[in-house]
From Swiss-Prot:
Heterohexamer of two PFD-alpha type and four PFD-beta type subunits. Coiled coil: none annotated. SUPFAM superfamilies: Prefoldin. The keyword Chaperone applies. Binds specifically to cytosolic chaperonin (c-CPN) and transfers target proteins to it. Binds to nascent polypeptide chain and promotes folding in an environment in which there are many competing pathways for nonnative proteins. One of its GO terms (biological process) is protein folding. PANTHER family: PREFOLDIN SUBUNIT 6 (PTHR21431:SF0). Belongs to the prefoldin subunit beta family. The gene is Pfdn6. GO terms for molecular function: protein-folding chaperone binding; unfolded protein binding. This is Probable prefoldin subunit 6. GO terms for cellular component: cytoplasm; prefoldin complex. The keyword Nucleotide-binding does not apply. Keywords: Chaperone.
Length: 125
């Protein structure tokens, strides 16, 4: 293998490594997104249940091992804020995932280009 082929091979290996790292990050992001979606659904169900309650119903919040009485409206507001926060995090993770996918596509194209160049260099020898 001459110097040019070795350099091309090294560049291709670096691109492959970058691509694999992006794949790992993407997988982590997908898992994180699944957790967020689960939390969002759970909180929406809680809010639906809270909306079914009347003013005479009592709501308790768990603080460590103790149940503490909480106002119904305060509970609704807290759950609503949690839903907003989780929704923002979900949007942020979706945007990050889209950017990672674009980067992965660029790296995939670079790897293909380097593979082609390596094949051409090998054929010339």
């Amino acid at each position: 293998m001459d110097k040019k082929s070795a350099a091309l091979y090294k560049k291709m290996q670096a691109e492959i490594e970058s691509y694999q790292n992006l794949q790992k990050s993407c997988l982590k992001m997908v898992k994180q997104r699944a957790v967020l979606e689960s939390q969002l659904n759970e909180n929406k169900c809680v809010l639906d249940e809270l909306n079914l309650l009347g003013p005479d119903n009592k709501v308790y919040k768990l603080f460590g091992p103790v149940l503490v009485k909480q106002e119904l409206e305060e509970s609704r507001q807290n759950v609503g804020k949690r839903i907003e926060y989780i929704s923002k995090e979900l949007k942020s993770s979706t945007d990050a995932l889209e950017n990672m996918e674009k980067d992965m596509l660029k790296h995939r194209e670079s790897v293909a280009k380097y593979q082609q160049q390596c094949q051409v260099a090998a054929a010339m020898q």
